[in-house]
Amino acid sequence: MLVLGCLQCFTSAWGFASRRICHSSSATPGQHSVGLGHGYQHGAQSWAERFLLRYKGLLWFVGSRAHSGGEETNGKLQAGGCYSYWRGSLGIYFERGKEHGEPLIITKVEDGNKAADILMAGDEIVNINDQQLLGYRQEAICLVKGSHKILKMIVKRRNDISYRPHSWHSNKLIESAMDTVTPQMSNASPFWNARYRSSSSSHDLSNPWDQTSLQRNSGHFSSMGSMDSIDQTYQFGRLSSAKSNNSIDYVGSQNKRDSAYGSFSASFSTPDHTLSKTASASTENILYKNNEWDNTKLGYGKTSPSMNEVRRSADRQVLQSTSINETSKIQRTEDNTEPRYSGRSNFGPVWNIPDKKKTASPPPPPPPQRSDSYAVTKIHEKPTNLMHLDASSTQHFNVANRSQAKPDWSLEISEQQRPIRAHDRTVADTRRTSNSSYHAGLNADQGLSPYKDKYPSNLPNVSRIQASLSTNDVRFAQPAYNYHHQRQYSDESTLFQSTRTSAQHKSQQQPMKYESSVNQVPSDLTYVYHPHQFRAPATSAGFSSGKQNVENNGQNHFHVVSIKHPQGNTTHHQFKEEENYAPEVNSGRKSVQPENTVISIEIPAYSLPQESFEPSQINCEKNYLKISEKKDNYLGNNEQIINKTTGYSEEKCNDRFSQLDHSEKGSYRSSQDYSWRKEENKITPLVTPMLHSLAQEGRNRSESFPDTGNEKLSFPDAGKQSRRSDRFATTLRNEIQQRRARLQKSKSTAALTESNETETSDNWKQDSLESMSPTSEGSFSSTYRSHLQEAQARVLRATSFKRRDLDTGISDHLSLFQDRNMQISSFSGLSLDPVQPKKNTAVNSSQNVSRIGARKRFTTQQKLMSYSEPEKINEVGVEDQYNFRTENSTKRTVGSFADRWKFFEETSKCAQPKVPPKVVSSSQSEETSEIAINRDYAKSSEGQESKRALAVSGQNPADENGFPDKVTTERRQRLGTFAEYEASWKEQKTQLERKNSGRCHSADNILDADLEQNPKAQYIHERSKSSPTTDFYAQAAAVESKQQSESVRRDTENSNSTHCRSSTGDSPTRTVEAGDQCGATNEQEVLTCNTKWKPHDKSFPIPETSNESQQSRARSGTLPNDYRFAHENVNQGNRDISFSAVPISEACPDFSNADSDQLQDHPSVFKKRSAAPQRPPPPKLENKYWRQNGSSSSLATSSESLLTAQARRAQSYSPSSQDTFPPQSLQKQSPSTYPDKNPSIHIYDYQLSVPPENDRYHLEKKYFESELSSKSHLQIPGMEPSRSPSPQFAPQKLTDKPPLLVPEENLSRIERVIDNTTVKMVPIKIVHSETHAEKESRHNLLSAIEPTALPTGLAKDQLKTLSTSEQSYSRFCAYTRQESREEEESRVTDLYSCQRNAEDDNENDVSSLAPSNAKSKDAIYADLKSEELVREIVDKDKSLADILDPNAKMRTTMDLMEGIFPKDEHLLEEAQQRRKHLPKIPSPRSTDDKKDEQNVPSAVSLTTSSTYYSTSAAKAELLIKMKDMQEQQHIAENSEDELGQNLSEKKQELIDSISKKLQVLRDAKETLLEDVQCNNALGEEVEIIVKEVCKPNEFDKFRMFIGDLEKIVNLLLSLSGRLARVENALNNLDETVSPEERKTLLEKRKLLTRQHEDAKELKENLDRRERTVYEILANYLNEENLADYEHFVKMKSALILEQRELEDKIKLRESQLKCLTDSLPLDRIK
């Protein structure tokens, strides 16, 4: 608490160390040295110094002009810096001012002072920082200290430069009055001090500058008060400086600068208390007369000058409309748009900004000061309600918490100060908006505030409501977003309407206050850009306040304030109209609605035509709201309070309420303050007749206008003032307790919602409860937030990205819904008000959320696109749901398509923040159908979510009840995975939709989400980057192939010549059976393909149907879903065509198969469909990648899916190559070409029946021989989802996918050759990596599988790798022999390159394929042999069991990472491809070279192909095991006698094998490092681009996300590794281990598990941030750069994981090698 009287000493309680400012010894008692050097003896920094330290800037003494017979010195004093300047001591000494009944004169200016040249002793300080002084020294000191960068002093100087007599001071006139007022204010002064904010306007200051006022001012202007209010005000209120228009926000810490800025400069409108209530002719004076001091109390006089202006305007208007006798004065104020500061009114407005009313006012009207611009900015940023709300709520939370935390008025001061700071900004804006109206509002506020202070009941409301609605009213912490300035009302501020609405409601809550607001708002009647994008006339606030005023009856200075147009005249005129009209309005409103009645405010949302406005039954009036049909004439904006108020108005009201709720927090503080004040300052007809009437009016309003939204804020607070006066603090406490109880009830989100609803009702019922909320506000805020946070955490865990599930989101959504409901209700007649208020209530503490829209000044599109708005995140799903609920009504409500669109955006902002619903290409319609189908399919899983997705999706463009995005929304929402989400991003910006899956898409999540997503994402996602599940689901839905995949398709018919109709669709493209599946199997599947191919459709005319499915696949090709889809396709193929794996890539991948050239030609397509790798222009990679997408997706369905399916199935068939071939050939063909060619490739469907033999692993060779028309037919072996082709076929795809890639590569080569021949049928070597066993039986996977003998040597290609364990272990099909596979893969890689060359050369590389197959077979056998060796060695040397067969028991780091980072090997392939594309990377060796090098260690081959490294560690281990097992088998074949003798030999053999594998791993690691380097380089490029195009704050988000991505991945890996080690230790504990040791391990495991879960939550949050960043970047980056970004992000984590995996594998191999070596006799060691 600051003692303003003399500031002899004061201790700042504002969180700083005690600061004392004492009269310097050099200064006379009447003087005060502002200079810090001399300014305080105690050596503590004064607030001024601290402030200056914090806000470094230049000091300026500005302005000289003749004035009042005296010469106003216009001195510009520019100091090098405030700090140094002040540090050196300002050296200006003020003689006592009004405190001593004397003018405030500079008695001394130290020599050498920078001001010495300008200032002279005897100068009377008239204005500081545009704040007219009442003449109080403390006021001047506070203002000086509060100055931010500039110290602007206007001094009156007699011509003779001698001290002027005090009489010269204009305040002299009012001194008596002030003295008189002071006693009146005395009881309030303590409150004032506490509440008085430095940010309060000069008007407010005028009040404070009474002795009482001074006390208040001292608190108000004191560094503590001002700083406190400053910093705190915006901490939450200004959630984003970037969004905030306030200069302070932009400048830096909103709180700091804002506070300092707003509270000291803008807010610091030096109160003109000098003007006696009688002497002051200005409205504010009148208002002061009415309740000048009271108002000041309410406003703390510290409301920013803009608030003062508003207050003045309000005063004028209020006085006019009010019974206040000062109507004439108001008019005069009207004339003087800027209310003259009492006593100082003669002096021109501190601000040089001409006010609209300025012209009228003889003295230059004080335009909003810095704080004004500040306020405006803030205001824009926040809803009017939020101004206070921000201060009290979101700041809110800070402010509310702090202030709430502070029970006393001093706390309240800080709280209010904060709000006031927000207010200051708002006020400044308001002031800027309409000085006169603003001032009128302020005056009204001031008028009210004293009484309110006296009568806390009103005050709490006032604080919420903005003490007299004047944004200036500091006490009421008027919402920063009260737009008193047009700018404030401009669309700039998203929250504008809400803010204004809040203000209005607040105004309504407090008659005086709202009067001010009304004046202010009406002045600024400009349509506000509602946070919900609903623009309502600023007048609506005015109306609300007007209503309240009406309720207040004559005393209520209700003025329907015309919208303050940018033109001051208009505003002026409107104000006059208001003045004239106000009585009518009052009477009319009163007549229309009882005192309690609240006039719903017509706020055209979205600047909708008035006609579109629905009468907004203010949800605030939960119970009922009488809408004044009276159209305020001053509402030049055609804004009519009348029922025309649109649902948006209702929404605004809701927003207001929610904002008010935020304000309520401040109000609660205020209430507390008020409560004690009300005891001291009880509003009574005798003591405070005006306030009493206002209170009565407010009470009536509160009664008539139940606080639905403002449960805390409760408009009834005005009415409550009387009640509170009756109940006082007791009632408040009771209310607080009740509110707390409610909060507790609402601990759960659902509970919160219900509580909020209940509270809303209760609030309406119990205004007092709302009143008591001041105390509970903070608790509510904190408790509510904590509950919300907990709920959010729970929900996030459960729902991942389903923000709608977040309770907080619910609250927000409720607010939005409320708004919409209000619209709907008003529009449809639904009585949503009660519910909405409830929602608002729920949101109240978290009203920050309501600010969601308002915070941002982003355009609607930006808002839609910005997930960066945390508030809106929660709103994503809820709004969608709500939209559906209120879809019809909302549609009705929304007037035009644009409106509907805006509304939709608003509702689905979270879901698709930035992306307007896009209609996809022609295939989109199909997709729509697909979506419908998928929707049906997904509905089972998604249910309402899919509906929301539909709402979001462009499916229902605008025609769907004005929800153009309805379908789109559903689709987006369907996106189960972030990858799909990303895909949707790329494919359709409209599709930006929050991911259903929460955190990284675990395989499970992906699957589930994808099922839903597939329908919506298929066309939505150009590529489901990380969510193959989309395809999988589409497939599952279409074919139910999953179920079939459950059953092993052992009987795969020889591939039927299946023709997949490519985009041309006329000619069946050889899609193998996949084509049929895509085209015929299922619409969804086809749709999926089509979706997948849609991107391709752009480049390749593929039947949209198939394209859809393929697009999904293509997109998901890189994703597990693709694999799953392929898997499903395989199943489908079996069902439909006995085609297994090829479906995706081949069915639809004609495009994939299209020549790499085409791919190159259409890199965008690739980009869309696949992750970055696709983007890379190199057709080969892309082709491969596409084929990979298609085939791997089909053949190598997500490894997880496949593994799962494989585990399910005893056997799996994975002809990876088969898919690959057709797609590539198709790719080779131009879209038109291949259709024309109508290549029908029949891939022989080889059925691998691999009986798993647990004990022995032997390859059972099944040759499915069918004549191989290498060029006539490619027979695709029906393969289980374990369509993992032999590694040789997927040299680049290290996993199953690689095999797919390899087959694709092979196919590509073959097809390319064939394609060269047009409709060439290319024999496709199909490598079935047939693994049916689960991980557990991975080592048992050695069921013998021999490649079917293909006539063309495809049989070799058809080699089926049986590495069940590996396959199960990894998503990738296990390769029978790692080594062989490596060789095979290297061959495949070579073959692939050869194929590429063949494409170019039209050479047929089939021959090369055969060698590759042979190599693959050799590799498989080698692996099997190795596995056998391992088994044999383990059988004979148990000591080596654990190390040689770790998978039996051991858990690996990657096991624990499973699901957290859905593994997409396509990414690795992409990385490799990118790297290979780099000039520095040599192209794969030619097939011939490979053939020559067939004997080269497989490690070399593997290294070349990078397949091995791409293979998961588990996979590698499996391969090794298999190989070892083969060796063991061979050993087993030896007689037992020989075993003993040959054991060492076997060990040596195994050592050799492991050594080779180890070398391969090391080579792979090197390759991986290259990939990492390439990816990092890409990231740097992306970063440079992002930095250039994005805003600094957005770039920071990007950088932080990238940095956190690596950190979180490493954290998860570290924790997973540690946890795996602990679990392995536990699993391997001997029975003899002591219980203590076991307990220790168990505790470690528990701790690590908990930490691991926490890390996973971080990952989920990171995923959300990733979406946010993506949305941001999507606004700036082109598709290619965006694809680069996506690829970089994906690869960053993927490479980290892969690197860790390789390291683990290397360690394992090294340990195995070491153990084996150690176990060998010395003589046997080589």
From Swiss-Prot:
May be involved in endothelial cell morphology changes during cell spreading. Required for eye pigmentation. In the retinal pigment epithelium, regulates the biogenesis of melanosomes and promotes their association with the apical cell surface by inducing gamma-tubulin redistribution. This is Protein Shroom2. The ASD1 domain mediates F-actin binding. Residues 1427-1721 form the ASD2 domain. One of its GO terms (molecular function) is actin filament binding. Residues 788-877 form the ASD1 domain. Residues 917-926, 1191-1205 have a biased composition (Low complexity). Residues 294-373, 425-451, 657-676, 697-785, 913-968, 1007-1080, 1092-1120, 1166-1240, 1269-1299, 1471-1499 are annotated as: Disordered. Residues 329-338, 657-667, 936-948 have a biased composition (Basic and acidic residues). It comes from Xenopus tropicalis (Western clawed frog). Interacts with F-actin. Residues 318-328, 746-755, 769-785, 1054-1070, 1104-1119, 1209-1235 have a biased composition (Polar residues). One of its GO terms (cellular component) is microtubule. It is found in: Apical cell membrane; Cell junction, Tight junction; Cytoplasm, Cytoskeleton.
